[in-house]
Amino acid sequence: MDTTRARKLYNLVMKTASDPRHKKRQDIVQLLFSYSFLDQKINNEKAKEIISKLGEIDTIIADIAPEFPIEKINKVDLAILRLAIYELQFEKETPPKVIVDEAIELAKEFGGDASPGFINGALGKLLKK
């Protein structure tokens, strides 16, 4: 890898890691992940809003990834998709490209090897609709 490309990659990683919005998204993914196992009280307002719309969000997931039933999707990937779909479909404050890029970064941080591709494919399909 050449020096310029390495520097750009380093700056991208450092920007994402130090960005307070990224940290908030990390926290929400962790809350949504734990909520999928324990029906617990959530104190984060955005996470509460997402949970209140899970029926609608999960219907969208079933539509964009029909080969993956909700109950079979990795819980980390599901939490990331739920956050991204909420931001894309209900919040609409952040540009779609930023939301997708953030979701892919979260998948790289928290998910398995196939997670970034799965998240990218599902959200790409949603954006084409």
Predicted regions and their residues:
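N-terminal interaction/assembly modules
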Residues: 2-112, 116, 121-129
